[in-house]
């Protein structure tokens, strides 16, 4: 389910004719942030999830800002650099040690339990896929993402803030 969730986020970048090489490192860094909190005694799974999501979103925002505000030549360059920064950051915050969530029953439940015979992680992926489908097909933001991917200049001329859409996608 990890690859399925990462590919969902990557889909937005691909639709806008870009690429984000840092998605795996971003997910790893976010998990290491949560792992650092577990090592410090935090056992609230909701807070761990919020920290991981906020951390990953912040990194994506930085990637988007590097691309749209600093006008780096191609997303390949900025996200490749960010990938290396995130790998280093993950090693620093974990002190190059393996982090285990085995003492946290709620986190273990998410990764190993089933509901009606389906793994919980699979159900989470399905929910995220449905949300992404609704976002891309039923909202103005979804149409804007497709427009920016098709022709950023035409999207800008039609009133779409291409820079904001690209920043959102990363």
Segments from the language model and where they lie:
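Short coil/turn motifs that cap or connect alpha-helices
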Residues: 62, 151, 161-163
